[in-house]
């Protein structure tokens, strides 16, 4: 499946939970195990919660076995802090947004 999902998250008390659940669904869709998907969702939810004021926009591009997520919002300090915190998910700060990539963990033969 290929597609794009966009969320516009206004400054409300529930936006971190909305972001968390959206990331969990996307991660499971591309084949991540549920525990890993929950870990990714929780981390992104925390990042969205820490983003003060304004609107946060999340855009996810699904490409079969991976999903690329761009989070727009926050300032340079927020992006720098959360790029480090989301490093396990390949987070990068670029062009005014924070991007990360979620992929299925490849299985290895024993």
Segment roles from a protein language model:
Residues 1-45:
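Bergerat-fold GHKL ATPase/HATPase_c domain
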Residues 1-5, 48-110:
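Conserved beta-strand-loop-beta-strand hairpin that lines the nucleotide-binding pocket
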